[in-house]
Amino acid sequence: MESGKTTIAKIIKRNEPGGRVPIWLMRQAGRSLPEYRKAVENMNNFMEICYNTDLVTELTLQPVTRFDMDAAIIFSDILIIADVLGCDVNFVRGVGPIIKPVESPKELKGPQEIETKTLPILNAIKKVRSQLPKEKSLIGFAGGPWTVASYIIEGRSSKTFSKVLNFYPSCLKEIIERITEVTIIYLIKQIEFGADVIQLFDSNAGALSEPLFKEYVIEPTKRIILAIKDRFSDFPIIGFPRSAGNLYKDYCEQTGVSAVSIDYNVPIKWAKANLNIPLQGNLDPNLLAYNKTEAIKEAKRIIDCFRDLPFIFNLGHGVLPDTPVENIAALVNLVKSY
C-alpha cells in the first residue's frame, strides 16, 4: 500500500515530519470541480451517487488527477451510516440532508446488513487504491456517532440542536451506542478493502458542553479507536471534532486518535503548544473561495508555524462549492513548493 516515499499515513504513524508538507483538502472532490458536475449531471439522487462504485471511483480520483493531491478521500457522506441503520435519508438541493426524524432507538436496524449495503462503497475503495499511486494515501471516513445521531434526531442540519439536546438522555445514549457499533464494523471493512488512513468527522462537536462532549464525543470515539487498533495496531486515525475549542486538548489526550484536524477558528499557536499529536488544518475555506491573495498569505503563516511538526495541510472545513479551481491549484502549488 505504501512506498518508500513519505506518505500521509507514514507521517501520522511515525509522528514525525516527512520533509515537504503534504496537502489534501476536505471535500476536494465535489461541486467546485467542472469534471464532477459533468460526471453527475444525469444523477438526481445523491445517495445513488454514493452507492455507484464506478462513479465513486471516478469522483474520488478527480482532484488527485487535476491537482496532484497527496491523498484521495473516498467520495461518500457521513450519513451512509444513517442509511444503513434504516433512516430515510434524502438530499434536497440547496437545503442539504433531510431525514425522517428518529424518535426511538427501536426504529434503528441492526448491523447485520452493513457489509451488503456498503459493498459498492467498499469496492470503490478497493478500486481507487489499485489505481492510486503508491505514494498517495487513500482516506476512508465516517461521521462521529454524536454528529450522525444529531442529524437523525433533528431530521436535518441544525444551528441550535434543540431537539437532540432535549432528547431523553437514555434514548440518545442508546442511539449513539448503536451508531458506534455500526461505525466500528464499517471502518474496519474500509481498512480491509484498502483505506490507508481513517478520518472521523464530528462536525457538530461544538454544540456540546464539556460534560456532554466527554460523554457523546470522547467516549464513542475512544471506543471506535480501541476497536480499530485491536485489529490494526498502529493504524492512522485522524479525528475532527469541529468547533471543539479548548476541548480539542481533551479530545487528543483521551480518545487515542493518531492525529487531529483543527478547524479554522483554532489559533495555530495555541494548537502548536497544546496538541501533542500530528496536526492537520486549518485554512479558512471562505478565504480560499473568495480571497486568493489572503488565502496564500495565510497558508504561508500556517506552514511557518507547523513545518517543524508532523503536519498535513488542509482546510478548517470542506471546500466551498463555488471555490474557483484556479484558487485551489494556486494553494496546492504554494504548499508543495514553499
From Swiss-Prot:
Q: Primary place of residence?
A: cytoplasm
Q: Does the keyword Electron transport apply?
A: no
Per its record, the protein catalyses: uroporphyrinogen III + 4 H(+) = coproporphyrinogen III + 4 CO2
Under Enzyme Commission nomenclature, its number is 4.1.1.37
Q: Name one GO molecular function term.
A: uroporphyrinogen decarboxylase activity
Keywords of the record: Cytoplasm, Decarboxylase, Lyase, Porphyrin biosynthesis
Concerning InterPro entries, the annotation shows: UROD/MetE-like_sf, Uroporphyrinogen_deCO2ase_HemE, Uroporphyrinogen_deCOase
The record's annotation in Pfam families points to: URO-D
One GO CC term on file: cytosol
Quick one: which residues bind substrate? R27, Q28, A29, G30, R31, D77, Y151, S203, H317
Q: Which residues form a coiled coil?
A: none
Q: What does the UniProt entry say about where the protein is found?
A: Cytoplasm
Describe the task this protein carries out: Catalyzes the decarboxylation of four acetate groups of uroporphyrinogen-III to yield coproporphyrinogen-III.
Q: What is this protein called?
A: Uroporphyrinogen decarboxylase
Query: Which organism does this sequence originate in?
Result: Wolbachia pipientis wMel
Gene giving rise to this polypeptide: hemE
